[in-house]
Amino acid sequence: MSMFRKKRKEQKTYELIKVPENANFFTKAWIWYRNYRIKQKIKKQKPQTFAETIWSWTKTLVGAIIIVMIINGLLIASFVVPTGSMENTVMTGDFLFVNKFIYGPSTPQVVPFVNIPLPFYKFPGIKKPEVGDVIVFIYPGDRDEVKSKEFQYYLKRCVATAGDTLQIIDKRVYVNGKEFPLPEHGQIDYSEPISPYNKWETFPPGKGYTRDNYGPIRIPKKDDIIQLDQKNWREWEYFIKKEGHDITFDGVSILIDGKPANSYKVERDYCFGMGDNRDHSSDSRYWGFIPYDNVVGTPIMVYWSWDTNLPLSQIGKKLSSIRWNRIAKFIN
């Protein structure tokens, strides 16, 4: 039986190359590289300890996370559509590739997989959001809060940009006096009675606007001057606070950062977002303007789509819910 026994593979021996005293720069560089390769081969011959194995896996995992953060911050991100506010342009359960480069790449905004927000810097982009663009953005927070309680990405259509005047009359949207048509796959029920409700819930507070009859309102542009008085300062209270300033009324004067003021100079550009499913969308009509700095990117295409409400324990139903007709569908 011994004649069939495999011979144990003998380990090769390696010796490091000595650097001659009179070697030039290129020779030294080549020898350094060869010695580095030899050291790697010697290292592979030695069996790893448990601690070394754990350290190797840790380095690989950390490296993968860093690569994901760089790609996610600079180029392409993934976004899962959580609600039907943009139906039928996108559907609940669509998984989207998002182009982040177009509006300006940024350093990572969250820790991957756990969604913990990070301080980030945004670089200049190819263009700013335009009317008609579908945008992914960091939710700026509810109407009456300075900062959102949790970090969330939202998806809406930009219907007006900085300096535009927007008005909704009987569900029809007008920008600078011209009707903004319902997008190709958008939804709206013109036969449904015009809704007088929720005038206390819309933005700005106290204006009495409704979902279906709204404005006119100017979308703030950097360096705009907003005139303030005792009647309207509440309308702009949280807008000004979100820009990082304190505003109060002492019974006589309006105070911004403790100093009397009758006007406020806008510090950023903003846009106005609405869902294509206009009757069933929580959007800028309710919580206000979207800072350009919050706009992350624009969706490119659907790379996967299924019912995200079904648990993985119901794998059969989950797989049967795959919408093959939506995969590889471009978004516009």
Q: PLM ranges: what are they?
A:
Residues 2-53, 89-332:
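Soluble "head" domains of membrane/secretory-pathway proteins
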Residues 56-75:
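Hydrophobic membrane-insertion alpha-helices, especially the h-region
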Residues 77-95:
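Alpha-helical transmembrane signal-anchor/signal-peptide segments
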